[in-house]
Design a protein with these regions (language model features):
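Small/polar-rich, solvent-exposed N-terminal microdomains that initiate assembly or binding
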Residues: 1-47
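Generic structural motif
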Residues: 23, 39-41, 64, 108-112
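Generic signal for short, ordered secondary-structure residues
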Residues: 38, 56-57, 84
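Short, solvent-exposed beta-strand/turn "edge" segments of beta-rich domains on protein surfaces
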Residues: 46-50, 94-96
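Oligomerization/assembly interface segments of phage tail-like spikes and tubes
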Residues: 51-65, 99-109
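Compact nucleic-acid interaction/catalytic patches
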Residues: 68
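Acidic-leaning, charged glycine-interspersed low-complexity segments
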Residues: 72-116
Length: 116
């Protein structure tokens, strides 16, 4: 979703939709990167017409080092983009030695007059 891409771009942290994949720019996983997916649902109808929908962003921040600063940057960027934090959790992957901060974000948008 464009709204998520635009918000995450301001962090300066490499962000990948769905999964990190090797590219010419990133032949190996960066020390810090974001992977995200989105889901859109219809949330409000008036007289059988769509009035509002919700965009959920499921985001994972992966970091070899302390992820605190990057997590703050993401929080500021997503809030500036109009998203609200729904939940957040953290973990550590011993095999890869990456910290992972998983979060769910929500953006409510008014539907256009044609229902899109």
């Amino acid at each position: 979703m464009k709204e998520a891409q635009d918000a995450l771009r301001t962090t300066g942290i490499p962000a990948f939709a769905l999964a990190w994949r090797s590219t010419a720019a990133y032949p190996t996983a960066p020390d810090q990167y974001i992977v995200y997916t989105t889901m859109t649902t219809e949330s409000e109808h008036w007289d059988d017409a769509l009035c509002q929908y919700q965009i959920y962003v499921y985001l994972n921040l992966w970091s070899k080092g302390d992820p605190t600063g990057a997590a703050r940057s993401i929080l500021q960027a997503m809030r500036s983009g109009g998203f609200a934090l729904v939940e957040e959790s953290d973990s550590f992957e011993e095999e890869t030695e990456y910290f992972c901060i998983s979060s769910t974000w929500l953006l409510r948008k008014e539907a256009d007059s044609d229902g899109t």
